[in-house]
Amino acid sequence: MEKFKRYLETFRSEQKYFLYPLLFQEYIYALGHDHGLNGPIPYESIENLGYGDKSSSLIVKRLIIRMHKQNHFLISCNENDFQQNRLLGRKNNLDSKIISEAFSIIVEIPFSFQLVSCLEKKREIAKSHNLRSIHSIFPFFEDNIFYLYHISDVLIPYPIHPEILVQTLRYWIQDVPSLHLLRIFLYEYCHSGSFISKKKFFSFSKKENERLSLFIYNSYVYEWESIFLFIRKQSSHLRSISWEALLERVHFYGKIEHLVVVLCNDFQKALWVFKDCFMHYVRYQGKSLLISKGTDLLMKKWKYHFIYLWQCNFHLWSQPHRIHINQLDNRSFHFLGYASSVRINLSVVKSQILENSFLMETSVKKFETTVPIISLIGSLSKEKFCNLSGHPTSKAIWADSSDSDIMERFGRVCRNLSHYYSGCSKKQILYRIKYILRLSCARTLARKHKSTVRVFLKRLGSGFLKEFLAEEEQVLSFFFPRSYPTSYRSNKDKERIWYLDITHTNDLANHE
């Protein structure tokens, strides 16, 4: 690790983008496999080794020696002769996998220095701990969404041709051999079983190399968003000064904790907000939301801007139906596991001027956040807590654990969901989810003891409910009693609490 840090400092001082020689350094492979290579050296054959032993010191050293002695990297990536010119001849898939994992570490180096330079210029961003919570975005919506009228739901298109990705990364990686090697890996993935497609496009799957796939995806999204921001800035009458670079914003919301691991976070957790006087832009989980107070014609223009941008710059055909434009008053939109909507409350006010009295009708917009019950039950069904109809079932995989362990696991799941969905406007759905988890826990315990649920619940008594009715820990939060009349402030079902300790989406809420 110390050698790696020294190389980074040398790289930073000289500003020479020579990444390719790092492939011949053993410690890079240790970082790629997330463990050291100083353990005992096995002498078994590769076929008899597990995954942990396959990435051992002996295999890595032999691989480096072979790369020194022979020219394993055949650069030709032509569609016609690619089958004859594959990395390492494809005789050893293990070598290709080890090299690709190490290469995914290496290509992140230029981005790490980009991140460091951003933090050195604006160190106060790292001090904004409260804004690291993803729940902090909902009060932002609540304060601004009342003045907005239209929302555009954009599904970011992919896959993309490998050559377009290589051209995009040329601005960041100026080491020609590294670009050639990246091209080889992209074509390898396009021709492999999990990535194969008729048009030989690269799909951002995480089956082959999760780290490299996420790095390429973030680079692709960063490129098209940079172009979008440039177009938006030029089209605005006022010069926008409220947006920052993606790297800085990702750190701003606490998505990157280490300088070495740059732009490799799961894109399901990536969150970025672009704001000016007229529109708000949010990207989350492979989707984008464009909310504006402009007219429907303006939103349609931006829709075709997106389509032309993907077609002309990335050679992607994005069907128009992948971009939906709606009025905020007429629909709800899914964001960070919540179903959000704007509801209009009509009220009648009686006014009197001198001897004349009249009725005046006013409308007040209210920002609603509810739990998408159908999607959440679908997530619970995938985890075997219930069926698709919401009927609780026993979780057989936990039946071998102790009773206290089973109850603690179910209670933890229930508390985490209650904590994450503390900002929902209606708590009745949460009560139903708690009921499903409580009865699923009872069925699991009854299955373990070969008893019925009724008999088991009678035996446990009220103590069984403690794990599911335990109070939330007191943490710093946003609490908005002003959103409700005074008579409702004491009603727990109407309180919305946004916690400041939530830095990622709940696994069950992440159902898309």
UniProtKB/Swiss-Prot annotation:
GO CC annotation: chloroplast
Bilayer-crossing regions: none
Stretches of the chain forming a coiled coil according to its record: none
Biological processes annotated in GO: mRNA processing; RNA splicing; tRNA processing
Keyword set includes RNA-binding: yes
Compartment(s) of residence: Plastid, Chloroplast
GO molecular function list: RNA binding
Pfam family, any one: MatK_N
Main location (coarse class): plastid
Keywords: Chloroplast, mRNA processing, Plastid, RNA-binding, tRNA processing
InterPro entries: Domain_X, Maturase_MatK, Maturase_MatK_N
Protein family (similarity comment): Belongs to the intron maturase 2 family. MatK subfamily.
Task performed by this protein: Usually encoded in the trnK tRNA gene intron. Probably assists in splicing its own and other chloroplast group II introns.
PANTHER family linked: MATURASE K
Protein name from the UniProt record: Maturase K
